[in-house]
């Protein structure tokens, strides 16, 4: 069996590693570097360049040099992040026919996985050159907060590159594997703070060692899929553009060539300011006007850079608090803090993290290589090369379906260990309902519309039955890659529908954070909404039952009683159209009072009929949840 290689497919740089005996080894590419810039260029003569060669020619070919593609993978064109990148990137971001964010290069439409595949091909070739044999299998890492669409798109990129992706694993988890495997760490709880080129993750991970077997269990994860070194670069670039404009009265944003030179200079200055207190951004002949050439020479201090990016660093602190809270731990429970990602070399980032956790982060983990090493370790586990290691990862957000009253009913809660499978039985909302719509949601809010829609499908051909009698079993199955499969089965007929959720629109981090923040800020509003839905459902049940009893009673019920009941029902139905819980409760009570005689008659009939009704009701399964489907008619 061939090697399963480990690939860290990064926003800014990528890295490949393999298991060499019991140790993971990071491989050098054809240029002799251990990391490869995630940059792809399409030249005028039809050549595709990847890595350092692509980076070197970027200044002369800015429109056809693509970088930070990971920020677009699995995203919709209308996503806020894609729109933001569209305005600042030198290359052209367009809407695909299905609404995804794609790119246009030399008049040709290209999907982000197609472009990322070029980087993966280079990683594959690097491993093949070292091993002297073909490589067909890989473990690829993704940010822990990547959603279904982004994970699926990453797998697609692997397939395009000629790799069978054996497992998608989360970057902080991979870093924990790299840290924990070769150290006699015993039982420890660690925090992995991963601030890379385009994404940010925090994971709280417990490492347990029992009889020589190490278990890496993720307790909680959080993050921001659109926060990273690229944003830090953008802040510095904007500052330099504004300073040059003040000094020379010219806006460099209109000159793609100048902006590409500026991008390189800003990235270099940012890196230098991690070790120096000040640096010069010196770009002669940056542009020209009628009076002649213009030169840029601007001094940038570390303090200035820190003031430009302070809010970005602070944005990474809030997810730390949420992750600890979700794990049920306090700062004092964390024994080690590991920094991953090139941006964590910035002293300000290190200080903020140290201040938050009350301890210095470890310096013995290489922030650029740890993730690829962890991916190689996981590859070794899958191929059997590495024994006595068990990895337990989690899903970052709750997953559920929409049930009657517009409620989100979770089937799998956030931070559940994966792979996992959960089934729940639901029923129909109307008599003789022949179809139900399974609307799959992701998020933390009670109201369905406040969560992210992942997709929906219909289960039709349901056997005609009174409301509440049909048994619809919904199963959520998350595989080890964190990809969701949903099925719905009519237990009476055995009819089943399945889908793999391939959300064409991915959840972005800001939406996720907003959901979590909203869930906390609106806990009271959610509680009231839940109570209102319960009151509505009880009233609805009462109307349905009363109407049925009226039909059965026929002429046996005095006319004045029948009129009073019908009036009370009308009043309750009118109240149900509003949002006033107290009003619905009052009208429900009024209907209960006037339908007393009807209830007596129904009880007498039941007594006369003996225990038959009891027998049929007993057949209903115990685990049926009191939440029902309404059929959603597809918009034509």
Swiss-Prot record:
- Domain of life of the organism encoding this protein: Bacteria
Induction field: By stress conditions e.g. heat shock.
Tell me which UniProt keywords the record has, alphabetically.
ATP-binding, Chaperone, Nucleotide-binding, Phosphoprotein, Stress response
Q: Which residues carry this modification: Phosphothreonine?
A: 199
Q: Which InterPro entries match?
A: ATPase_NBD (IPR043129), Chaperone_DnaK (IPR012725), Heat_shock_70_CS (IPR018181), HSP70_C_sf (IPR029048), HSP70_peptide-bd_sf (IPR029047), Hsp_70_fam (IPR013126)
Q: Say yes or no: keyword Nucleotide-binding present.
A: yes
Q: Which GO terms describe its molecular function?
A: ATP binding; ATP-dependent protein folding chaperone; unfolded protein binding
Region Disordered: start and end of each range?
Answer: 603-636
Cite a single Pfam family from the UniProt record: HSP70
Q: Which HAMAP family match?
A: DnaK
Q: Which family does it belong to?
A: Belongs to the heat shock protein 70 family.
The UniProt function text for this chain reads: Acts as a chaperone.
Protein's UniProt name: Chaperone protein DnaK
């Amino acid at each position: 069996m061939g090697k399963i290689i480990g690939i860290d497919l990064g926003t800014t740089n990528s890295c490949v590693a393999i298991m060499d005996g019991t140790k993971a080894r990071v491989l050098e590419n054809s240029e002799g570097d251990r990391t490869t810039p995630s940059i792809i260029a399409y030249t005028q003569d039809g050549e595709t360049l990847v890595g350092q060669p692509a980076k070197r020619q970027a200044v002369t070919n800015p429109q056809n040099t693509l970088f930070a593609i990971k920020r677009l993978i699995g995203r919709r064109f209308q996503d806020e992040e894609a729109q933001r990148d569209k305005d600042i990137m030198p290359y052209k971001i367009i809407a695909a026919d299905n609404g995804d964010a794609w790119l246009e290069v030399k008049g040709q439409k290209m999907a982000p996985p197609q472009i990322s595949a070029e980087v993966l091909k280079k990683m594959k070739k690097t491993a093949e050159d070292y091993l002297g044999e073909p490589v067909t299998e890989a473990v690829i890492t993704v940010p822990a907060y990547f959603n279904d669409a982004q994970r699926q798109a990453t797998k697609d990129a692997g397939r395009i590159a000629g790799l069978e992706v054996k497992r998608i694993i989360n970057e902080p988890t991979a870093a924990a594997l790299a840290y924990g495997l070769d150290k006699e760490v015993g039982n420890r709880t660690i925090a992995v703070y991963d601030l890379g080129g385009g994404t940010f993750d925090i994971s709280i991970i417990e490492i347990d060692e029992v009889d020589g077997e190490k278990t890496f269990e993720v307790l909680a994860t959080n993050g921001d899929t659109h926060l990273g070194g690229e944003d830090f670069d953008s802040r510095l670039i904007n500052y330099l553009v504004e300073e040059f404009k003040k000094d020379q009265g010219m806006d460099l944003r209109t000159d793609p060539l100048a902006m590409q030179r500026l991008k390189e200079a800003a990235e270099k200055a940012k890196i230098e300011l991690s070790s120096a207190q000040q640096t010069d951004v010196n770009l002669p002949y940056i542009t020209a006007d009628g009076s002649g050439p213009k030169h840029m020479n601007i001094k940038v201090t570390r303090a200035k850079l820190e003031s430009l990016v302070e809010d970005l660093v602070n944005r990474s602190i809030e997810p730390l608090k949420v992750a600890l809270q979700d794990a049920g731990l306090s700062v004092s429970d964390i024994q080690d803090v590991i920094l991953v990602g090139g941006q964590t070399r910035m002293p300000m980032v290190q200080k903020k993290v140290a201040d938050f956790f009350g301890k210095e982060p470890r310096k013995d983990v290489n922030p650029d290589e740890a993730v690829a090493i962890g991916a190689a370790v996981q590859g070794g586990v899958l191929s059997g090369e590495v024994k006595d290691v068990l990895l337990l990862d989690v899903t970052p957000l709750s997953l559920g379906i929409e049930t009657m009253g517009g409620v989100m009913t979770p089937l799998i809660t956030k931070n559940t260990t994966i792979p996992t499978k959960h089934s729940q039985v639901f029923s129909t909302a109307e008599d003789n309902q022949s179809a139900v719509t399974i609307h799959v949601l992701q998020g933390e809010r009670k109201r369905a519309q406040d969560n992210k829609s992942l997709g929906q499908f219909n289960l039709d051909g349901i056997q005609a039955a009174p409301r509440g009698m049909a048994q619809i079993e919904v199963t959520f199955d998350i595989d080890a890659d964190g990809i969701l499969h949903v099925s719905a089965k009519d237990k009476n007929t055995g009819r089943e529908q399945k889908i793999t959720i391939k959300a064409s629109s991915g959840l972005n981090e800001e939406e996720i954070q907003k959901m979590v923040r909203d869930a906390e800020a609106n806990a009271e509003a959610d509680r009231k909404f839940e109570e209102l839905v319960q009151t509505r459902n009880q009233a609805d049940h009462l109307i349905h039952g009363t109407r049925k009893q009226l039909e059965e009673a026929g002429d046996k019920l005095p006319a004045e009683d029948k009129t009073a009941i019908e009036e009370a029902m009308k009043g309750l139905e009118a109240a149900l159209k509003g949002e006033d819980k107290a009003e619905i409760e009052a009208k429900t009570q009024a209907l209960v009072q006037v339908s007393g005689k009807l209830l007596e008659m129904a009880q007498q009939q039941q007594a006369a009929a003996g225990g038959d009704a009891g027998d049929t009701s007993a057949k209903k399964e115990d685990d049926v949840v009191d939440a029902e489907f309404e059929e959603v008619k597809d918009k034509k």
